[in-house]
Design a protein with these regions (language model features):
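Ribosome large-subunit tunnel/peptidyl-transferase-proximal elements
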Residues: 1-103, 113, 131-142
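C-terminal structural segments of small proteins and small subunits
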Residues: 102, 109-131
Length: 142
């Protein structure tokens, strides 16, 4: 009996909606990363990009547990000498919550072409509305 491997041509991609309101940021990111990777499928193949599309709504209502709001720091570099900028997680969640969720999911994906392709299937929205109703996404409960 031989193992059947998943091929790109026979792949079906579904759409899922995750509501991040009142949910911890990390747990939401773990679920999204697993769906983007395709680990929830029975025929998951590690070397094939077999993940589904993920829509995360209400990113502005995601929560940070513990002291992470004040202690976690996001860094970026302007490119100039001494141009290291830092932003606390509380400020990041107030101003750019979708980017904070994007960084969390990106850190949980593989650092290769499969991870980069998976990030193109992630859609983030601050409010409860999204323009992907035509794809008929299924709700994923945490």
């Amino acid at each position: 009996m031989s193992t059947t491997l998943l091929k790109k041509e026979t792949l079906e991609r579904k759409w899922y909606v995750i509501d991040a309101a009142g949910k911890p940021l990390g747990r939401t990111a773990v679920i999204a990363a697993n769906i983007l990777r395709g680990k929830h499928k029975v025929d998951f193949t590690p070397n094939v990009d077999c993940g589904d599309f993920v829509i995360i709504i209400n990113t502005d209502k995601a929560i940070l547990t513990g002291k992470k709001a004040e202690q976690k720091v996001y860094y970026r570099v302007s490119g100039w000498i001494g141009g290291l900028k830092e932003t606390k997680a509380r400020i990041m969640m107030e101003k750019r919550s979708d980017y904070a969720v994007e960084l969390a999911v990106k850190g949980m994906l593989p650092k290769n072409s499969i991870g980069r392709n998976a990030m193109t299937r992630l859609h983030l929205y601050k409010g409860a509305e999204h323009p992907h109703a035509a794809q008929k996404p299924e709700a994923w409960t945490l």
